[in-house]
Curated annotation (Swiss-Prot):
Pfam families: Ribosomal_S13
GO annotations of cellular component type: cytosol; small ribosomal subunit
UniProt superkingdom: Bacteria
Keywords, comma-separated and alphabetical: Ribonucleoprotein, Ribosomal protein, RNA-binding, rRNA-binding, tRNA-binding
Family matches, as PROSITE patterns: RIBOSOMAL_S13_1, RIBOSOMAL_S13_2
Task performed by this protein: Located at the top of the head of the 30S subunit, it contacts several helices of the 16S rRNA. In the 70S ribosome it contacts the 23S rRNA (bridge B1a) and protein L5 of the 50S subunit (bridge B1b), connecting the 2 subunits; these bridges are implicated in subunit movement. Contacts the tRNAs in the A and P-sites.
GO biological process: translation
Assembly behavior: Part of the 30S ribosomal subunit. Forms a loose heterodimer with protein S19. Forms two bridges to the 50S subunit in the 70S ribosome.
Name of this chain's protein: Small ribosomal subunit protein uS13
Similarity comment: Belongs to the universal ribosomal protein uS13 family.
MF-aspect GO terms: rRNA binding; structural constituent of ribosome; tRNA binding
Species this protein is from: Rickettsia akari (strain Hartford)
InterPro entries named in the record: Rbsml_uS13_C (IPR027437), Ribosomal_uS13 (IPR001892), Ribosomal_uS13-like_H2TH (IPR010979), Ribosomal_uS13_bac-type (IPR019980), Ribosomal_uS13_CS (IPR018269)
Length: 125
């Protein structure tokens, strides 16, 4: 397994698919990186030479934010929004959907498991 941005990428998959295992790289960015490195997108990761691996690593490290750096930036952005108490920050604090989704009947994943109302009994027939 080749290691890029401290992630083991799978050997038996195409390079474009393998690069998407790195947090922050999607299919479009992976294709762009392959073009910059002048490596075929259809090449398997196990077929890469050491020189090609080094060029991939250099391109990713110099031009893109991935893995830990990107996670840290996202976390800091959310913390900043919470600190300035903007609308999105308040939604994060209250653990509600941030981007305008409905919450009346949905958003169970974000809100957590449904809690029954205490004291309410079902009618006996």
């Amino acid at each position: 397994m080749a290691r890029i941005a401290s992630v083991n990428i799978p050997d038996n998959k195409r390079l474009v698919v393998s690069l998407t295992y790195v947090y922050g790289l999607g299919p479009a960015m992976a294709a762009e990186i392959c073009n910059k490195a002048k490596i075929s997108k259809d090449k398997k990761a196990k077929e890469l030479t050491d020189q090609e691996l080094i060029s991939l690593r250099n391109i990713i490290e110099s031009e893109y934010k991935v893995e830990g750096d990107l996670r840290r930036e996202v976390t800091l952005n959310i913390k900043k929004k919470k600190d300035i108490r903007c609308y999105q920050g308040l939604r994060h604090i209250r653990k509600l959907p941030v981007r305008g989704q409905n919450t009346h009947s949905n958003a169970r994943t974000r809100k957590g498991k449904a809690i029954a109302i205490a004291g309410k009994k079902k009618a006996v027939k």
